[in-house]
Curated annotation (Swiss-Prot):
The lineage of its organism: Bacteria, Pseudomonadati, Chlamydiota, Chlamydiia, Chlamydiales. It is found in: Cytoplasm. SUPFAM superfamilies: Pyruvoyl-dependent histidine and arginine decarboxylases. InterPro entries: Pyr-dep_his/arg-deCO2ase, Pyr-dep_his/arg-deCO2ase_sand, Pyruvoyl-dep_arg_deCO2ase. This is Pyruvoyl-dependent arginine decarboxylase AaxB. It catalyses: L-arginine + H(+) = agmatine + CO2. GO terms for molecular function: arginine decarboxylase activity. GO terms for cellular component: cytoplasm. Binds 1 pyruvoyl group covalently per subunit. It comes from Chlamydia caviae (strain ATCC VR-813 / DSM 19441 / 03DC25 / GPIC) (Chlamydophila caviae). One of its GO terms (biological process) is arginine catabolic process. The modification Pyruvic acid (Ser) is found at residue 53.
Amino acid sequence: MPYGTRYPTLAFHTGGIGESDDGMPPQPFETFCYDSALLQAKIENFNIVPYTSVLPKELFGNIVPVDQCIKFFKHGAVLEVIMAGRGASTSDGTHAIATGVGICWGQDKNGELIGGWAAEYVEFFPTWINDEIAESHAKMWLKKSLQHELDLRSVVKHSEFQYFHNYINIKQKYGFSLTALGFLNFENADPATIK
């Protein structure tokens, strides 16, 4: 029996950071630091598959903190995510990394929710920062990106933008920061029938 395309109906937001004095070439921050960031984000035992940025309307109101979902995690399962994550080396002059994910929801001409879009943000800083700087920069750049996604599609904003952010001040050689949405539950659209 055929079935249509799959779409998520439950998501969680999470974030993590990692740092290390050790790493393996060619991108040393992609090994130990990335694993530590996944561990802090509580998604270290998933096989991570990245998405682009389109959200079905069924996710509206169904994005929760990661701690509400942990009991449903399955070791070794595939986790589809929208993730803003990058690493850096202090030897390159980066001493802090901020990451964020923003969400906008759009409506049709009748005011009905049609779905949403996400945007990712990563910024490198030459000095240490604090949470206020990380949050304000994330909101500034994500707001611009989310509005662009709506304008590009000639879609009107349905509700307030949502923002999630994270940051690291790198104290060791390498650091990594990530902010992510993970998708857990799914349904299927009606199958296509071509006559």
